Amino acid sequence: PQRSPFTLPNVPPPHARSAQPGDGEWKPVPEVGETEGQPLALLTTLHPHPIRKDVEVVVIAFDLTRSELLWVAGAKEPESKTASPEKRKGMVPARDHDRLLAAFNGGFMAKHGRYGAMLDGAEFVPPREGACTVGITKTGAVRVAPWEEIAAAKAELAAWRQTPPCLLHDGQPHQSVRHDHKKWGLSIEGKPEIRRTALGIDASGRVLLFGLGEWVEPRYLELAMRVAGAKTAAQLDINWSYTRFNFYAKNAEGQLEVKRTLVPKLV
């Protein structure tokens, strides 16, 4: 059957005072191209702080009817005493190089919360109750929800990765996101204003949204993901050292290299 076009309605900026030109307008991402005459991804920027204009979140949305999410375990993280080394190459498999659109960071180090992870039946870290879980089914669908909602269907999952509590679930912010920043991590100085990344899914299950926020508290990252269209969203990681989103292309020698980053100075 013919797939429907990939378009998203523009969204109003969260706050008129901090909004910048182009906020909330979805535009195709040339680095990932298109298929069937349709873009594979759309991009927008939002300024979720009511006053500050330096607090911004860049959101990229992927059409999951034309692309798929894969999880690759890191060479060292999440640290595990049970998973086979064969499961943690820390590299995108060569078989996927020709169709690779982008790669981005996963979640916290295992020692920071002991959030669970599983890949192809190998459990790196046991699941933790209350943790937000990004699950990829064996058919390629993506679910983002608290572990309690995913656990019953875990046999259907090819991979799952846990994070701190969902920033946003079923369209509602987490009850602690406005005041309990520690759940989602702080800077070395103990401040909540830091770079953060998030991954969400829309109500249809078709649109995967990745957000990268600069100088952003958890509540403002949640707001940006919600405004962009996420029904549920998980924070992935924090700090400048661990947040990444790279677009790739092959060089003259046929080797993959970073073509561009989602925002400057990510490599």
Region annotations inferred by a language model:
Residues 1, 184-185, 255-256:
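Short, structured coil/loop segments at alpha-helix boundaries
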Residues 209-211, 216-265:
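C-terminal soluble interaction/assembly domains
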Residues 1-125:
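Zymogen propeptides
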